Amino acid sequence: KNQNIYVKEVATGKEKQLSLDGTLGNYYSAYIRWSPDSKKVASCKIRPVEKRYVYYVESSPADQLQPKFHKQEYAKPGDELPFKVPCIYEVESGRSIIPSTELFDRQYEVYGPEWNPDSRAVTFEYNQRGHQVYRVLELSAETGKVRPLVEETSDTYVNYTRHFRHDLKDGKQMIWMSERDNWNHLYMYNRITAQPDYQITKGEWYVREVLRVDEDNRQIYFSANGMEAGEDPYLIRYYRIGFDGKGLTCLTPEEGMHRAWFSGDMKYLVDVYSMVDKVPVAVLRSARDGKVVMPLETADITLLEAEGWKAPEVFVAKGRDGKTDMWGLIARPTNFGPNKKYPVIEYIYQGPGDQYVPKTFRPYDWNM
């Protein structure tokens, strides 16, 4: 309260103020984390920014003759951003640990902090403005020093929206996702040495998402694309692999775009898969080896086909470099005549941000 951090003794209701310098212009966050040993708390001190506005005139409003003047809150490129400084307070002594900001001073965002299991440090993540540097940092509760556990750098862009981190319970290792070898893969990181012990997944394919980390059985369940040779690299399948990088198992072996839901005990998964020219199929599978336990449903498109519907044709052609496979669709009119000539409408997105070519079955698509 009052922009500061307080603790209250539950039994007596007695309050103790830990921080003394919080103000409206530099306040302590309500994001507060107790250490596992209950002797310390961690939070962030935040320096907010003033609201920024743009102004514009509505020349012809519907309800009056005179123009209207509008003001809208709107941050612009280059504007100052809020600044966060992770901090630690010892509850009994009131000692504060406020670190140097050298390793996280050009902030786009700071995430955390979260306590390490041994209560000796907190871990937080730093996303540098411009997205060319991303760090996992550790703040010592004893010395107040900050050290990097992981650092990702790029001359272009660090894809922070795709990153994944899982700290193992022993506090000695963590699983980290990185594009450092030009593919998105998982690494086992040593938190003591701040170096990767080894790469868990590797190859010319892309880890999409980690669904579950099973520490007891040392297994990772994840989705990926591009692993199967000769297939559209955007088709997603599900896999599991051991912490040691061994025992890679495909849990959804049929060609197609898969979407899976795992049971709470990770023994089974419901898998729904299709392609633009193959109807959706739903099955129950074993999460150990991917074998089908029970078929659930297969879509019936008899009525759709009776109306003349035809599936689009999947094609692959080389890109302008003569090497890269480009996957696309050819959608023909329902009354297509093979002996007629038709104009070709090319609908593409050339940017790097996403892919828009449909991969799953659909009876119609506004793009086609």
Whereabouts are the PLM-identified features?
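A conserved hydrophobic secondary-structure block that centers on an alpha-helix together
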Residues: K1-G25, R106, Y111
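Beta-strand C-termini and the immediately following turn/loop, strongest in propeller blades
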Residues: K1-N4, E9, A42-P48, K76-E80, ...
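Beta-propeller fold detector
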Residues: E15-L20, I97-S100, V146-E151, D197-K202, ...
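Predominantly five- to eight-bladed beta-propeller fold
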Residues: L18-R33, S43-S100, R288-L304, Y356-D365
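Short glycine-/Asp-/Thr-/Trp-enriched loop segments that recur within the blades
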Residues: T23-A30, F104-V110, S154-R162, G203-V210, ...
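Beta-propeller domains
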Residues: V49, Y53, P61-P196, R208
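Serine-hydrolase catalytic core recognition
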Residues: G112, S119, E125, C250-T252, ...
